[in-house]
């Protein structure tokens, strides 16, 4: 309920105070997809989906992880049925239904009728129960409505906006694109939040972006994959005028800098933050740690579906390793606090933290959540 109220507050207000700089709204990129390492017949270790991206199950999993919403990508089949697919071709995320074999030639959803797509192909997953047909936009929006999840539509199809508006209303979805004329079509039918990707404009001066946002009108903001664009000054200039700022799938550790700079929405493949009012199943607390006192914690309990988060107040440089795979090297010249974390499945979490010779960790709070 608290997450839903926060979501409504953000989407129904352009006020900068809707969120604090270190607590952005969290949106799961292509849903709460998951993957695990598997060994191929040739002995190679590769990552395989468990919960496929852009699937109905990815909406439910995003809700389970505690995200406020999901982002999805919309395309037409040959007979103009709207389905979810990110890549230009289906080859990375889809297999043949008959024998679960990989596609040998490039194939687009637009090459197939909807019936052909549903009959002959399934989403790739290491879990046979997840090998289901590519979902329609309507199916995914219905799942968003079921769980009270915001749907962020990365789409160039005005018909997709009309469907989202009809099913979810102004506060239930977001239009997300880099083309002004497409976003104008969304504004004609809805007072939803609109996020403009300014990446295609030649001059990315913030005031030129503001001119584009003013033409769109209503609730709007920007979304960018370019971390060099979303500086503290850029974010502050937009947010002081009531616009939202979304960092889009920044890689480790750059999402932390985006939060320092003041983004209001974090579109992410992995990130999780410490949660208010949610009890952790395992925790670690440390104070006043110096260079000679590194933290090395391996929890013994395996968690099926969880998150490891860290809140750290420090000065100097710290090196943080989450679950042996996500490394953060963070520096502060004056004392301050950063919050970071990652979602994971089917593992016992671990944490390593070291501080530079001239630094000190004032407080370290690590929490493991189980969903």
Question: Where are the language model's segments positioned?
Answer:
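Sec-dependent N-terminal signal peptides
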Residues: 4-13
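Phosphate-group recognition and catalysis centered on beta-loop-alpha active-site segments
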Residues: 18-295, 350
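Short proline/glycine-enriched turn/loop motifs at strand-loop junctions of beta-rich domains
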Residues: 305, 312-317
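Short, surface-exposed beta-strand/strand-loop-strand elements in extracellular ectodomains
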Residues: 318-324
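Solvent-exposed serine/threonine-rich low-complexity stretches and specific carbohydrate-binding patches
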Residues: 326-334
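Exposed aromatic-hydrophobic patches
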Residues: 338-344
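Short, aromatic- and glycine-rich surface loops/edge beta-strands on solvent-exposed regions
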Residues: 349-357
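Edge beta-strands of extracellular beta-sandwich domains
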Residues: 361-369
């Amino acid at each position: 309920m608290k997450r839903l109220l926060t979501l409504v507050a953000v989407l129904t207000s352009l006020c900068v105070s809707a969120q604090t700089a270190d607590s952005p709204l969290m949106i799961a990129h292509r849903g709460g997809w998951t993957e695990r390492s598997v060994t191929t017949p040739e002995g190679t270790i590769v990552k395989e989906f468990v919960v496929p991206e852009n699937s109905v199950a990815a909406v439910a999993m995003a809700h389970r992880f505690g995200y406020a919403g999901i982002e999805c990508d919309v395309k037409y089949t040959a007979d103009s049925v709207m389905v979810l697919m990110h890549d230009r071709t289906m080859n990375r995320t889809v297999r043949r239904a008959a024998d679960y074999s990989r596609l040998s030639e490039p194939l687009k959803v637009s090459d197939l009728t909807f019936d052909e797509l549903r009959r002959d192909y399934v989403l790739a997953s290491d879990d046979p129960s997840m090998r289901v047909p590519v979902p329609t936009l309507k199916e995914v929006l219905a799942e968003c409505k079921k769980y009270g999840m915001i749907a962020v539509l990365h789409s160039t199809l005005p018909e997709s906006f009309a469907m989202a508006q009809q099913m979810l209303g102004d506060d239930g979805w977001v239009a997300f694109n880099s083309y002004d004329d497409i976003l104008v079509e969304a504004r004609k039918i809805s007072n939803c939040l609109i996020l403009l990707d300014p990446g295609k404009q030649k001059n990315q001066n913030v005031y030129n972006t503001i001119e584009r946002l003013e033409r769109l009108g209503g609730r709007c903001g920007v979304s960018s994959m370019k971390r060099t664009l979303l500086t503290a000054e850029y974010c502050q200039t937009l947010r002081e005028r009531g616009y939202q700022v979304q960092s889009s799938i920044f890689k480790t550790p750059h999402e932390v800098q985006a939060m320092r700079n003041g983004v209001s929405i974090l579109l992410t493949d992995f990130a999780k933050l410490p949660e208010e009012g949610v009890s952790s199943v395992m925790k670690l607390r440390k104070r006043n740690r110096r260079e000679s006192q590194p933290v090395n914690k391996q929890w013994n309990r395996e968690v099926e579906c969880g998150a490891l988060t860290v809140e750290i107040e420090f000065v100097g440089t710290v090196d943080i390793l989450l679950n042996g795979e996500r490394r953060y090297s963070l520096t502060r010249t004056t004392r301050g606090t950063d919050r970071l974390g990652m979602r994971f499945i089917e593992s016992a979490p671990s944490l390593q933290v070291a501080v530079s010779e001239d630094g000190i960790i004032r407080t370290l709070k690590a929490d493991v959540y189980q969903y």
